[in-house]
A protein has these predicted regions:
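N-terminal strand-loop-strand
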Residues: 1-36
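Buried hydrophobic packing segments
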Residues: 7-10, 145-152
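Short, charged low-complexity intrinsically disordered segments located at boundaries
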Residues: 14-17, 84-86, 143, 147
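Short, contiguous, pocket-lining structural segments
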Residues: 35, 140-144
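Unchanged
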Residues: 40-137, 141, 151, 155-163
Length: 163
């Protein structure tokens, strides 16, 4: 089981989350996926360090510019070969995220509430399969990223209902 970490960077009211689009122009398992910045946990790293390193490598988010709030319970991929640790954080000030590597071709904020709408079955543009998710900015939000964001959305929704 390989371990990975993602940065779940939340900002604003209503809450938005930073996502990246994995490049559609390279032949990769993740091509055209809308994802949270993240990747493998290297030897000697913990999930926080890995998520912050990956956010810097993929979206020019410097580790000093975010405040980590919590680590959510890990999410297993459907293939079962990867365990993803979501690291929730907020910006300490203004950010200018942008693609920082050839594996990412877009970086943008989406409303967290988007995952409150039932996902549809759609054809993934780079895989020969249909997935349950959302089409966004030429990519597809689905799989473990979608499950992490839905879990976070339901936590936020229940917190907002309390008096």
């Amino acid at each position: 089981l390989r371990e990975a970490a993602v940065l779940v960077l939340l900002w604003g009211d209503p809450t938005r989350v930073l996502v990246v689009r994995k490049s559609c122009s390279i032949d990769s398992y993740w091509s055209c996926d809308i994802a949270l910045p993240g990747g493998h946990i290297k030897p000697g790293e913990d999930p926080i360090r890995a998520a912050l390193r990956e956010a810097w490598e993929e979206a020019w988010i410097h580790p000093s510019m975010v405040k980590v709030q919590e680590i959510l319970a890990p999410e297993k991929t459907l293939a079962g070969n990867r365990l993803i640790h979501p690291v929730v954080a907020v910006p300490k000030g203004p950010l200018c995220p942008r693609p920082a590597s050839e594996e990412v071709d877009a970086v943008f904020w989406i409303p967290l509430s988007i995952v409150g709408v039932k996902p549809r079955e759609i054809r993934h543009p780079r895989r020969e399969m249909f997935v349950e998710g959302y089409r966004l900015a030429g990519g597809v939000l689905w799989g473990a990223t979608l499950r992490i964001l839905r879990r976070l959305y339901s936590m936020h929704s229940s917190n907002m209902e309390e008096p």
